[in-house]
């Protein structure tokens, strides 16, 4: 956290803290979400100004209860943040919008610096761990982002019981849809009620996956036990290769 703040970067959660989905690895509360707070955007702008941030990541819980999945809220956040802080770069980390292309277009039209959508897990166990999600829908979403002028980014965790071949297949799939930024991190079991950790990967294994991803054409890759989707976000968007 200190490393992020030192770099003028922070991540903000919008649209409440209750998710409409119940993934087996996630500790976010599941249930009926709260209504959208119309003042939230103003609070967000105020926080970014007070913290003097140079790079902001805006994310949300999944809001399947909203017609557009919250795309309009993301769009407004990007537009109003840019108007208030023209020099601040804005990345959005979005849900899948249930494959709603019109919803995604709202976010793309707002012209964030980058759009991130995390695949989270490999294909063979995706349906089991993310029963309300869909691997192909998420990949198609990233394909549509990759074909837009906005930078495309994704990430996933390892340690669920996947094979090396599963990991390489996911890297290949992401490369095939023009995803240019990638994060790979170690899954940590939030509570005993969640999916157990099957394996803790060695840093050398993460280094190998990182190099493979670069060979596949990714412009920036972060891979390591403590890496999460917003880690080194600003450096990643610059396209610098950090070893």
Which residue stretches match the model-derived regions?
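Phosphate/pyrophosphate-binding betaalpha-module
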Residues: 92, 108-110, 114
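Hydrophobic residues within beta-strands of alpha/beta enzymes
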Residues: 56-58, 90, 115-117, 182, ...
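Active-site mouth loops of central-metabolism enzymes
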Residues: 13-14, 24-38, 91-100, 157-164, ...
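N-terminal pre-triad scaffold of radical SAM enzymes
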Residues: 1-29, 45-57
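Auxiliary Fe-S-binding modules of radical SAM enzymes
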Residues: 1-8, 42, 46-52, 76-87, ...
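Fe-S ferredoxin-like electron-transfer domains
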Residues: 34-42, 54, 70
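Conserved radical SAM core fold
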Residues: 57-67, 97-99, 113-132, 151-153, ...
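Glycine-rich tight-turn/loop motif centered on a GG-T
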Residues: 31-33, 63-72, 126-135, 194-203
